[in-house]
Curated annotation (Swiss-Prot):
Pfam short name (any one): Viral_coat
Tagged with keyword rRNA processing: no
Protein name: Capsid protein
GO molecular function: RNA binding; structural molecule activity
Species this protein is from: Cucumber necrosis virus
InterPro entries registered for this protein in UniProt: Capsid_prot_S-dom_vir, Viral_coat
């Protein structure tokens, strides 16, 4: 009979292998879960500003900086990109989404300066046919009767470096006829306000409602009923300089197609009564009207062809432009009794177009229309 040698240790190890493997796996899983829970706990304690997917949007940590403060780096650049307008149609309406340039924001020697310091308070009333805010949209809105903003946001993009002092502010007022803030105390009381240093970017979202309003194609409507409100900006405690640019982004619905409203401005002043009559868009305003001088102010950036006719007892005139404007080409005819001046001009920021050296100037009328510099005024 042959002897057989048996080793029960192998059978015992085989029986223990499965439980040991399961226990080891559970231990690894438990350890991973503990590590993951620890990472989540640390992540939850981090400030929200440091939780970006990458470091591009994270705030810079600085000693002694208050939470929410924005640190000033040595230099900072903002990319301003063009955007294609989007059009949608539905149930007799047209929806437009676009971004436009509004104006440069200027400061003056530490003063409290609102809307660059010139013009009526309601220049920037929110209505699609206002060329001060929507210079591109007016060409489309002139073909409709009603509008409704679905979204509206203004953005300030700086032009200055991080050593520039002062502050800039964007504000919104629901009443388009309110006079606007005259000091910092009044500015601080606005419910819709965004203030920041002039070297940083800021945005102001305007609250919109679901109300259809009429487009302002005449001067006889009640501004409180036809406008969504008014927008404005302020610079204070800073230098005399162009601090930054203002842009507007919007989505607006236009309703009820109509014959095109006048896009040519006609501004007539009758000297005996000093009454001014305007038809069309408000590109220019008559600031000075005397027997020797006529001065119009332009505040909407762009290029125009301007025609001015007036009465005078003696021929002769001297044209000039001051501020942020350039006369590209011009032509004039002046005789005793009546005179005419035609010019192609470009307005970059508030500018005054003047006719001086007049004698006995009386009734005056200005016509203005958007153009390009190639629409040169010349006599061949």
């Amino acid at each position: 009979m042959a002897l057989v040698s048996r080793n029960n240790n192998m059978r015992t190890l085989a029986k223990l292998a499965a439980p040991l493997a399961t226990a080891g796996t559970r231990t690894i899983v438990d350890n991973k879960e503990a590590i993951w829970n620890g990472v989540k706990w640390i992540w939850g304690k981090l400030p929200k500003g440091k939780k970006g997917k990458n470091g591009n949007g994270a705030l810079i940590a600085h000693p002694q900086a208050f939470p929410g403060a924005i640190a000033a780096p040595i230099s900072y650049a903002y990319a301003v990109k063009g955007r294609k307008p989007r059009f949608q149609t539905a149930k007799g309406s047209v929806r437009i989404t676009h971004r436009e340039y509004v104006s440069v924001l200027s400061g003056t020697n530490g003063e409290f300066l609102r809307n660059n310091g010139t013009g009526p308070n309601n220049d920037f009333s929110i209505n699609p046919l206002n060329p001060f805010l929507f210079p591109w949209l007016v060409n489309i809105a002139a073909n409709f009767d009603q509008y409704k903003f679905n979204s509206l946001r203004f953005e300030y993009v700086p032009l200055v470096n991080t050593t520039t002092n002062g502050r800039v502010a964007l504000y919104f007022d629901k009443d388009s006829e309110d006079p606007g803030p005259d000091d910092r105390a009044a500015l601080a009381n606005y419910a819709h306000l965004s203030e920041i240093s002039p070297w940083a970017i800021t945005k102001l979202t305007v609250p919109t409602d679901n109300v259809k309003r009429f487009i302002s194609d005449t001067s006889s409507g009640d501004p409180k009923l036809i406008n969504l409100g008014q927008f404005g900006w302020v610079a204070y405690s800073g230098p005399t300089a162009e601090l930054g640019d203002i842009f507007v982004e919007y989505t607006v619905d236009l309703f009820e197609a109509q014959p095109t409203s006048p896009l040519l401005e006609s501004l007539f002043r009758e000297s005996a009564s000093s009454v001014q009559t305007r038809m069309g868009l408000p590109y220019f305003s008559l600031e000075v009207a005397s027997a020797t001088d006529l001065v119009w102010q332009a505040r909407v950036p762009g290029t125009y062809v301007v025609t001015i006719i007036f009465n005078s007892t003696v021929g002769g005139l001297t044209p000039s432009i001051s501020g942020g404007g350039t006369i590209n080409s011009s032509f004039s005819v002046s005789t005793a009794g009546s005179s005419a001046y035609v010019a192609n001009i470009t307005i970059r920021v508030n500018a005054n177009l003047s006719l001086s050296g007049l004698t006995g100037a009386t009734n005056a009328q200005l016509f203005a229309v958007r153009a390009i510099t190639e629409n040169a005024v010349q006599v061949v």
